[in-house]
Curated annotation (Swiss-Prot):
Subunit comment: Part of the 30S ribosomal subunit. Forms a loose heterodimer with protein S19. Forms two bridges to the 50S subunit in the 70S ribosome.
PANTHER family per the UniProt record, alphabetical: 30S RIBOSOMAL PROTEIN S13/40S RIBOSOMAL PROTEIN S18 (PTHR10871), SMALL RIBOSOMAL SUBUNIT PROTEIN US13M (PTHR10871:SF1)
Gene name per UniProt: rpsM
Protein name as annotated: Small ribosomal subunit protein uS13
One protein family per Pfam: Ribosomal_S13
Summary of the function given for this chain in its UniProt record: Located at the top of the head of the 30S subunit, it contacts several helices of the 16S rRNA. In the 70S ribosome it contacts the 23S rRNA (bridge B1a) and protein L5 of the 50S subunit (bridge B1b), connecting the 2 subunits; these bridges are implicated in subunit movement. Contacts the tRNAs in the A and P-sites.
Keyword Protein biosynthesis: no
GO CC annotation terms, alphabetical: cytosol; small ribosomal subunit
SUPFAM superfamilies linked to this entry: S13-like H2TH domain
Family statement drawn from the similarity comment of this UniProt entry: Belongs to the universal ribosomal protein uS13 family.
Record has Hydrolase as a keyword: no
UniProt cross-references to InterPro entries, sorted A to Z: Rbsml_uS13_C, Ribosomal_uS13, Ribosomal_uS13-like_H2TH, Ribosomal_uS13_bac-type, Ribosomal_uS13_CS
UniProt keyword list: Ribonucleoprotein, Ribosomal protein, RNA-binding, rRNA-binding, tRNA-binding
GO molecular function: rRNA binding; structural constituent of ribosome; tRNA binding
Length: 125
């Protein structure tokens, strides 16, 4: 397995797909990276030379914030929003959707499993 940005990328996959295994690199950034380095997107990772791997590693680490640095930055942004008391920070704190989605129905991924609340008891006859 080849290592780029601290991630083992799969050897059998095409390079443009394998690069997306790095957190912070999607299809668009993978295409940009390959165009800038002049490496074909169709080549398999196992067929890359050491020089090409070094070239890819240098380009990605030099131009993009990826993996741990990006995760830390995102976490810091969320922490800052919570601390300043913004609406987004409040939604993060409560564990609710942040970007305006409805919560009357749906939003189960963010809210977690249903918690059943006891209903009102009927009066006995």
């Amino acid at each position: 397995m080849a290592r780029l940005a601290g991630v083992d990328i799969p050897r059998e996959k095409r390079l443009e797909i394998a690069l997306t295994y790095i957190y912070g690199v999607g299809k668009t950034r993978a295409h940009e990276t390959l165009a800038a380095t002049g490496i074909s997107a169709d080549v398999r990772v196992k067929d890359l030379t050491d020089a090409e791997l070094v070239q890819l590693r240098d380009y990605i680490e030099g131009n993009y914030k990826v993996e741990g640095d990006l995760r830390r930055e995102v976490a810091a942004d969320i922490r800052r929003k919570v601390e300043i008391g913004s609406y987004e920070g409040l939604r993060h704190r409560k564990g609710l959707p942040v970007r305006g989605q409805r919560t009357k129905t749906n939003a189960r991924t963010r809210k977690g499993p249903k918690r059943t609340v006891a209903g009102k008891k009927k009066a006995g006859r």
